Amino acid sequence: MTASLKANDGSAELAALMTDLGRRARAAARVLALAPPEQKNRALEAMERAIRAGAAAILDANAEDVADAKGSGANSAFLDRLTLTPARVEAMAEGIAVVRGIADPVGAVTESWQRPNGMTIERVRVPLGVVAVIFESRPNVTADAGVLCLKSGNAVILRGGSESFRSGRAIHACLVQGLREAGLPEAAITLVPTRERAAVGLLLGGLNGTVDVIVPRGGKSLVARVESEARVPVFAHLEGINHVYVDRTADLDMAKSIVLNAKMRRTGVCGAAETLLIDRAAADTHLAPLVGMLIDAGCEVRGDDAVQRADARVKPATDQDWDTEYLDAVIAAKVVDDVDDAITHIHEHGSHHTDAIVAEDAKTAAKFLGEVDSAIVLHNASTQFADGGEFGFGAEIGIATGKFHARGPVGAEQLTTFKYRIHGTGQTRP
């Protein structure tokens, strides 16, 4: 028997509210698990229309959130993650369209075989149930998580950061409109309607067994708290201490293009490069141009002795720099002996998120891709492709850096599990 839910640091009213949210989400999950793909896609199509029609209201709400964040002294990287623009709202709508177009994972038979006794066994994809997503400053997570959970037949409880509270409500209203138009329960996508921090603790407790999995999207402290306190499984999205290794066989122009994009396209995303590793054999030709390019682009470079000698503007790196996710226009840079030394550095300082090699030699690239133990490894491509949309998933609920169940971008398919269906003709076990 499940113990009654209590708010250790919140009110009885909050505990009652969260209990009710969990109960309603569980009921909605049972409906969604049986909803036909056509009905879910009608909801997604209506959500796409609602996002476009509600763009002005979403942007107005976001402007208030951004103004409050600026007044609180938020840095530029935080503001970039929080800010919505007309282009970003349109990208949100386009992402919903892509999710609508992907194959419905629910009910897919991934494997089937017949036993000697004539029984047929099928492995079939089924929803997880109720997913709780706890996130911080990115308002677009409201849409991404909502539509991916819907597509995969899951109900979702969203707890956004207080900084993006207004933005999240405006986006959520569009998602609920889509559910309503398609005849699906509104509790299928639930937004926690309070900024009270105690709501997070209640979610981590599982809401009396109604939550099946928790996905944290945010900084290191949030993820650490979720992993420490959660009483249900967690898809951990850890910090992105991502590396770009420039090999001795790298084409310089390609390396410059990839490194600049990996670091500076958007510095506040989890796929941004945070450390540049350069092969010692390429230092004479590649080091100064790469470092100079970054500094000229407005990026602060913190380097070891060899990197400091390449450009007087480089600041000395400390031991802490190799373990830091800056999410800002700052990068650590180091000269390594070879690809083996680069792999060793990544194993010691990386976060198993995303790492890239720039190299023309296929054997060296294969070694890097095979030995670097990260969720995403790239050859001759920017780390900023660490994104569910770029994988063709339409969106992502996070980048899972663990090794159980989901790894890498978590899309609709990764939000399912499986069960076995067995068809017999009266067989009994001897």
Curated annotation (Swiss-Prot):
| Gene3D superfamilies, A to Z | Aldehyde Dehydrogenase, Chain A, domain 1, Aldehyde Dehydrogenase, Chain A, domain 2
Q: Which UniProt keywords apply?
A: Amino-acid biosynthesis, Cytoplasm, NADP, Oxidoreductase, Proline biosynthesis
**Which regions span the lipid bilayer?**
none
Pathway where it operates = Amino-acid biosynthesis; L-proline biosynthesis; L-glutamate 5-semialdehyde from L-glutamate: step 2/2
Highest taxon of the lineage:
Bacteria
Record's catalysed reaction(s): L-glutamate 5-semialdehyde + phosphate + NADP(+) = L-glutamyl 5-phosphate + NADPH + H(+)
The keyword Chaperone belongs to this UniProt entry's keyword annotation? no
What is one process in the GO biological process aspect for this record? L-proline biosynthetic process
The record's subcellular location field reads: Cytoplasm
Q: Which GO terms describe its molecular function?
A: glutamate-5-semialdehyde dehydrogenase activity; NADP binding
The GO cellular component terms are:
cytoplasm
Q: Which Pfam families match?
A: Aldedh
| PANTHER family per UniProt | DELTA-1-PYRROLINE-5-CARBOXYLATE SYNTHASE, GLUTAMATE SEMIALDEHYDE DEHYDROGENASE
Instruction: Report the protein's function.
Output: Catalyzes the NADPH-dependent reduction of L-glutamate 5-phosphate into L-glutamate 5-semialdehyde and phosphate. The product spontaneously undergoes cyclization to form 1-pyrroline-5-carboxylate.
Q: Which family does it belong to?
A: Belongs to the gamma-glutamyl phosphate reductase family.
Q: Which NCBIfam families match?
A: PRK00197.1, proA
Name this protein carries in UniProt: Gamma-glutamyl phosphate reductase
The UniProt gene name for this protein comes to proA
